[in-house]
Amino acid sequence: MTQANNAVYTDISAAQLVEEAIRRGEGELAANGSLVVRTGHRTGRSPVDRFIVEEPSTKDAIAWGNINRPFPADKFDALWARVEAFNNAQDHFVSHVHVGSAEAYYLPVKMTTATAWQNLFGRCLFIEPEQYNPAGKDEWQVLNVANFECVPERDGTNSDGCVILNFAQKKVLIAGMRYAGEMKKAMFSVQNFLLPERDVLPMHCAANIGEAGDVTLFFGLSGTGKTTLSADESRYLIGDDEHGWGEGVVFNVEGGCYAKCIDLSEKNEPVIWKAIKFGAVLENVVLDEERVPNYADDSLTQNSRAAYPLEHVEKRSEKNLGGEPNAVIFLTCDLTGVLPPVSILNNEQAAYHFLSGYTALVGSTEMGSGGGIKSTFSTCFGAPFFPRPAGVYAELLIKRIKAFGSKVYLVNTGWTGGGYGVGKRFNIPTTRGVIAAIQSGALIGAETEHLEIINLDVPKAVPGVETNLLNPRNTWADKAAYDEAAKGLAKQFIENFKKFEVSDAIKAAGPQL
């Protein structure tokens, strides 16, 4: 709307941001109307470059370590001033957005970026409110200057780029980072620290809502199927990645989606396909001579992405929120082929598997993990984004599940009939069949079979899913090899779980040898 003399573009429209990005050579238009950009040598998040300022409010509240690295307050002040002065000497872009769709829990954010495209990205992913900050809350500031190069010896950073959260000053500093996912996840981490103080569980999950108002949550790491499975043409999307669960409400922290694009097809993912149009941003997607995206081309990265506002999704929850969840689904991509396509969990098992967060890094979003696919345990299905000790989030989850009576399921979107390289991955229609059965209530009170070693209960029948797939041992040609693989996986679970101090009932809910 306004443009000052010193080329500060404040709250200009998405169309103007696209225009500015192209004028400045930041990207190009694809045939489908989206803005296509490249993020340079960083095509994923850089966990080693992320810090939290250590000060009285964070000192004893954060699980410090490799994920949450402390940063000195004085160094932060010096670096913020340096980056801000650098940015003030060039054209830049400012937008005012909200993070958190529920009125009680939103954060007002002044987002300043050096590039037009990253501002557009923020406008896609965060919430553009009808009225900015109606409750007059204290404002957060995000300063994202991609062309600033940090000097580790001077600035105290790990490399030429950094992401630093300062809770005392309500500031997020992002410097030297072209991969825009850093901005989205930084504000997610902020809410993940703040929401538990309000008795709200922050979650790395997708959420959708049925015609009858029933809500389903999909927890999972990148690449396990959150975005794909929640984008269901028969249901209304609340969001694909970040939510809060408070008394009586599940709300989106964001106002957009950040979908993986590798091998995207109109047939398997029609909702996402249609959402990629003018106003959307494609990161590291290769175009052909006609400017048509080639989603199968992974020459830049496996982690190619599309950012688009929820307005691009036809069937969506108008207010970005819904009631409490009837079904809570933990998505795991099991490389070993040991886990069943669906297991029904009790409360103790829910706590165990939430804390474990077992899955695979598939086309990982983290730098340097491009080549192989490997198994991992990521607490709360999103360890990089949860600053407090894991127990805080697990206790809140169990409290919410018990209070509302949500049913919890573990769904394997990974391998069956053998491990990675031997078996085959469950196809999307099979997993959609499992999800549909869960959402219809068909598995509530279903007859189950207990699987020893991995200590899970599987339904004996799931409408629309081949019965021989339900017990994974049946899908292996070599049953002895399955038993060995199950023992190997159980050992990994037990070893990983040693770090948690929890009740014996929760410990006993996991795999047993």
UniProtKB/Swiss-Prot annotation:
Pathway as given in its UniProt record: Carbohydrate biosynthesis; gluconeogenesis
Residues noted as binding substrate in the record, renumbered to the chain: R45, Y179, K185, R305
Binding site for Mn(2+): K185, H204, D241
Molecular-function GO terms, alphabetical: ATP binding; metal ion binding; phosphoenolpyruvate carboxykinase (ATP) activity
Enzyme Commission (EC) number: 4.1.1.49
Location(s), subcellular: Cytoplasm
Principal subcellular localization: cytoplasm
Cofactors that this protein relies on: Mn(2+)
GO cellular component, one term: cytosol
Cystines in this chain: none
GO biological process terms on file: gluconeogenesis
Keyword Transmembrane: no
Cofactor info, note text: Binds 1 Mn(2+) ion per subunit.
UniProt-annotated binding residues for ATP: K185, H204, G220, L221, S222, G223, T224, G225, K226, T227, T228, E269, R305, T431
Family matches, as InterPro entries: PEP_carboxykinase_ATP (IPR001272), PEP_carboxykinase_C (IPR013035), PEP_carboxykinase_N (IPR008210), PEPCK_ATP_CS (IPR015994)
Pfam families per record: PEPCK_ATP
Annotated keywords: ATP-binding, Cytoplasm, Decarboxylase, Gluconeogenesis, Lyase, Manganese, Metal-binding, Nucleotide-binding
Catalyzed chemical reaction(s): oxaloacetate + ATP = phosphoenolpyruvate + ADP + CO2
UniProt function note: Involved in the gluconeogenesis. Catalyzes the conversion of oxaloacetate (OAA) to phosphoenolpyruvate (PEP) through direct phosphoryl transfer between the nucleoside triphosphate and OAA.
Subunit structure: Monomer.
PANTHER family in alphabetical order: PHOSPHOENOLPYRUVATE CARBOXYKINASE (ATP), PHOSPHOENOLPYRUVATE CARBOXYKINASE ATP
Family affiliation: Belongs to the phosphoenolpyruvate carboxykinase (ATP) family.
UniProt protein name: Phosphoenolpyruvate carboxykinase (ATP)
Gene that this sequence comes from: pckA
